[in-house]
Amino acid sequence: MSHTYNSLSNCISSLSASVALLNDSLKTIDNATKDIPRLKKVLSTNKVFGLVPESDLESAKRNIQNEIQPQINALVIKIEKELSKLKRKKTNLASKVDLQQVRLENAAKSNRDSLSGIKGITANRISKGDIDESKLARLKLLQNKKERLKYSLSRLNLQDKRARLSTIPSLPPHRDS
């Protein structure tokens, strides 16, 4: 029996050594794996930016261009029409200014001429002793009529000039393609 006891004792000590070895192994594994949840979180990747294929980008660009291009073309045409109107208006205003300047010059000149003519006639008649108030009034009336006719003539010339300008087709604006 002692032999059995020895063998049983050897078995128990071997089993105890195995249990101790397993406990040490468990402690080592626990120490090695206790940081795994943190490592899992650290090593996980978050998708911050998604990649889009270039074909999708090109397709989106074409779609936007197809939507916006007709609107842009319509606005460009509208702007060109308005610009053409403004150019015609500018030309008309410039011709009006020229006409008004000519009228002012003519009025100033005719006033000087009429005043000097009236003074000359009056001086001559006074010196001759032949003053006729009705003839003097008639002279002033005729001079006023002359001024009105000059004004009407200049207005008609301006209208004729405008009519000729409006029949001339305006050149389309130069476009860079």
Swiss-Prot record:
Cystine connections: none
Localization terms from the record: Nucleus; Cytoplasm, Cytoskeleton, Spindle; Chromosome, Centromere, Kinetochore
GO biological process entries: attachment of spindle microtubules to kinetochore; cell division; mitotic sister chromatid biorientation; protein transport along microtubule to mitotic spindle pole body
UniProt xrefs under InterPro entries: DASH_Spc19
Cellular component aspect of the GO annotation: cytoplasm; DASH complex; spindle microtubule
Primary residence: nucleus
Keywords annotated in UniProt: Cell cycle, Cell division, Centromere, Chromosome, Chromosome partition, Coiled coil, Cytoplasm, Cytoskeleton, Kinetochore, Microtubule, Mitosis, Nucleus
Pfam families: DASH_Spc19 (PF08287)
Coiled coil: 71-107
Family label: Belongs to the DASH complex SPC19 family.
Primary role: Component of the DASH complex that connects microtubules with kinetochores and couples microtubule depolymerisation to chromosome movement; it is involved in retrieving kinetochores to the spindle poles before their re-orientation on the spindle in early mitosis and allows microtubule depolymerization to pull chromosomes apart and resist detachment during anaphase.
Quaternary structure annotation from Swiss-Prot or TrEMBL: Component of the DASH complex consisting of ASK1, DAD1, DAD2, DAD3, DAD4, DAM1, DUO1, HSK3, SPC19 and SPC34, with a stoichiometry of one copy of each subunit per complex. Multiple DASH complexes oligomerize to form a ring that encircles spindle microtubules and organizes the rod-like NDC80 complexes of the outer kinetochore. DASH complex oligomerization strengthens microtubule attachments. On cytoplasmic microtubules, DASH complexes appear to form patches instead of rings.
This protein's name: DASH complex subunit SPC19
The species this protein was found in: Debaryomyces hansenii (strain ATCC 36239 / CBS 767 / BCRC 21394 / JCM 1990 / NBRC 0083 / IGC 2968)
Lineage: Eukaryota, Fungi, Dikarya, Ascomycota, Saccharomycotina
Gene name tied to this protein: SPC19
